[in-house]
């Protein structure tokens, strides 16, 4: 009887202990649902939604390596060897929809390195050098844009062809702080007005004028454009508040076929000197022209020619060949004739130069 009671008591104690341990056990919570990154196709390829928001983000950019030889076609100086330069450009774009329109941002950081034999390439620095620059940083809401961007005087009419040495005869400075508004109509018509701080020295210009405004009065830029399936025509006028002079450009683009297009641009400056922010060509006027021929799906031929009032003539041609998607090799040759008033500014009247660019865009 005692043994039976002992066994029953032990069993009861074990059951009670097991029940107590079960009551004290920690219950693991259910795992939260994983929120995968969603693709956003509202603003083009490469965007995705930032988790937990309705803002779309894209990370993109390029890696570039340039090898240059011959003369510097901007200054006429003999390089006496190869100049090499590399750049990593990191771009970040965002976009979202608001009750006031599309809200966008764009930033670009450039990490540059150069090993120049002659130290003549001001775009990357002299001798062996490296540096980082914030090239773009702007906010755009609808047609309103504020921040660091390129001047509307340069971009509204379009760049000077798809060549690397496109600004041997400069059509104006590039980077500036600005507030601009662009109106875009549904019939191909657009207009822009911009208040700008003044540009930097990215255009190959070597004068001494301080481009930035020296008071509260900004530089003012305005332009009109009409674009259709045949091409476009655009005009832009800029007032330089530092020297109190103005400059203007008119450009036309024509699409001959789907593969072949041509363009022509003329400019005039009231200052008649390149020592200014906008009219950086020599003399009163300058003219540029060019063409592009998409020979194959991978290869494109580009040509640009320019001439200014002081007698400088520049011609550049290249072939941009896409080896594989995202990787393009571009051999280019350029010629500059320093005639007229430009003769006194250079050691040689003629300059021949070449460059090969390797670029991976992503």
From Swiss-Prot:
Q: How does the record classify its membrane topology?
A: Multi-pass membrane protein
Question: A single GO molecular function, which one?
Answer: porin activity
Q: Which residues form the signal peptide?
A: 1-22
Please state where this protein is localized: Cell outer membrane
Q: Which domain of life, per UniProt?
A: Bacteria
The coiled-coil segments of this chain are none
Additional record remark: The pore formed by Omp2a is larger than the one formed by Omp2b. Omp2b pores have optimal permeability to allow growth and protection against harmful compounds. The larger pore formed by Omp2a may be advantageous for intracellular growth, when the bacterium is competing with the host cell for nutrients whose concentration is particularly low within the phagosome.
Comment on protein domains: Consists of 16-stranded beta-barrel sheets, with large surface-exposed loops, that form a transmembrane pore at the center of each barrel. The pore is partially ocluded by a peptide loop that folds into the pore lumen.
Question: What is this protein identified as?
Answer: Porin Omp2b
Source organism: Brucella abortus biovar 1 (strain 9-941)
| Gene, per the UniProt record | omp2b
């Amino acid at each position: 009887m005692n043994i039976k009671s002992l066994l029953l008591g032990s069993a009861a104690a074990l059951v009670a202990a097991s029940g107590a341990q079960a009551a004290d056990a920690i219950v693991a919570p259910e795992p939260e649902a994983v929120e995968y990154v969603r693709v956003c196709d509202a603003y083009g390829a490469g965007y995705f939604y930032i988790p937990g928001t309705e803002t779309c983000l894209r990370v993109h950019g390029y890696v570039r390596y340039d090898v240059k030889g011959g003369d510097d076609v901007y200054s006429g100086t003999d390089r006496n060897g190869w100049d090499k330069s590399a750049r990593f450009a990191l771009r970040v774009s965002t976009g979202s929809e608001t009750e006031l329109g599309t809200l966008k941002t764009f930033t670009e950081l450039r990490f540059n390195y150069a090993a120049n034999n002659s130290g003549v390439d001001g775009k990357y620095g002299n001798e062996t050098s490296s540096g980082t620059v914030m090239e773009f940083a702007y906010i755009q809401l609808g047609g309103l844009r504020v921040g660091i961007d390129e001047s509307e005087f340069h971009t509204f009419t379009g760049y000077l062809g798809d060549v690397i040495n496109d600004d041997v005869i400069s059509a104006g400075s590039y980077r500036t702080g600005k507030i601009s508004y662009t109106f875009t109509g549904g019939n191909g018509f657009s207009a822009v007005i911009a208040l700008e701080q003044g540009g930097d020295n990215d255009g190959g210009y070597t004068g001494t004028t301080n481009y930035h405004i020296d008071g509260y009065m900004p530089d003012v830029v305005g332009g009109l454009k009409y674009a259709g399936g045949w091409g476009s025509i655009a005009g832009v006028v800029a007032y330089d508040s530092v020297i109190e002079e103005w400059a203007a450009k008119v450009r036309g683009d024509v699409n001959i076929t789907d593969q072949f297009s041509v363009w022509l641009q003329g400019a005039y400056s009231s200052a008649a000197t390149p020592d200014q922010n906008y009219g950086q060509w020599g003399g009163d006027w300058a003219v540029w022209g060019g063409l592009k021929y998409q020979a194959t799906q991978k290869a494109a031929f580009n040509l640009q020619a320019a001439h200014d009032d002081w007698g400088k003539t520049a011609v550049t041609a290249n072939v941009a060949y896409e080896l594989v998607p995202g990787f393009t090799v571009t051999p280019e040759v350029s010629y500059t004739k320093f005639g007229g008033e430009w003769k006194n500014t250079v050691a040689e009247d003629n300059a021949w130069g070449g460059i090969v660019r390797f670029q991976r865009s992503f």
